Amino acid sequence: MITVNPIDSTTFEVIVEDNSTTTHKVTVTPSHYEKLTNKRVTPEVLVERSFKFLLQRESNTSILRSFELSEISRYFPEYEKTIQEMLK
């Protein structure tokens, strides 16, 4: 289960409950949000779907505890294209 709680307009606390529970702090810059979503979904939805993307590739305990959403592409080059498809 993925729970996304806004801390402020660009920062979110994400709690992932799986075999173990992890907490993550994620920052989403307005420009990256707009690039990925064209404002079709809320930042919370983008973060939640991004965690679904990550969990298909690694365990929640392997996900960085604090990161900017744009960093995902450094580890998974297919992220931007895939997340845009997931948000259609």
Which ranges hold each PLM region?
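Short, charged/polar N-terminal "headpieces" of proteins
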Residues: 1-23
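Acidic, low-complexity intrinsically disordered segments
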Residues: 40-87
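Beta-strand/loop nucleic-acid-binding surfaces
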Residues: 25-31
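Non-catalytic effector/regulatory segments
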Residues: 15, 87-88
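Short, surface-exposed linear segments at secondary-structure transitions and domain or protein termini
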Residues: 31-40
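A short, polar/proline- and glycine-enriched secondary-structure boundary/capping micro-motif
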Residues: 24-25, 37
